[in-house]
């Protein structure tokens, strides 16, 4: 997984899975969420996602109290959010 801020969006790309997500990437994502210019998270570059992506979303929710807009959230992550009954928290 890679993430970078572009035009106020955190652009997430690559595979976001429990096999690929590590502590360094989580810390970077958390710091990106805390930046005042960040207003949304764009998942359009994600090639594969599993429950690790839910963890990222919960980090964003905690850091910004749900104020970040989610763009192009993968359908697999939407399904997991529904399964875990957190879709209302994530406003999806």
Predicted regions and their residues:
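STAS-like cytosolic regulatory interaction modules
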Residues: 1-52, 59-92
């Amino acid at each position: 997984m890679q993430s970078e801020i572009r035009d106020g969006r955190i652009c997430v790309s690559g595979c976001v899975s429990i096999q690929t997500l590590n502590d360094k990437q989580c810390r970077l994502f958390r710091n990106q969420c805390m930046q005042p210019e960040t207003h949304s998270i764009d998942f359009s570059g994600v090639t594969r996602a599993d429950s690790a992506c839910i963890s990222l979303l919960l980090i964003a929710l905690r850091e910004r109290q749900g104020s970040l807009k989610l763009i192009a959230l993968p359908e697999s992550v939407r399904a997991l959010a529904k399964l875990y009954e957190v879709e209302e928290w994530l406003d999806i």
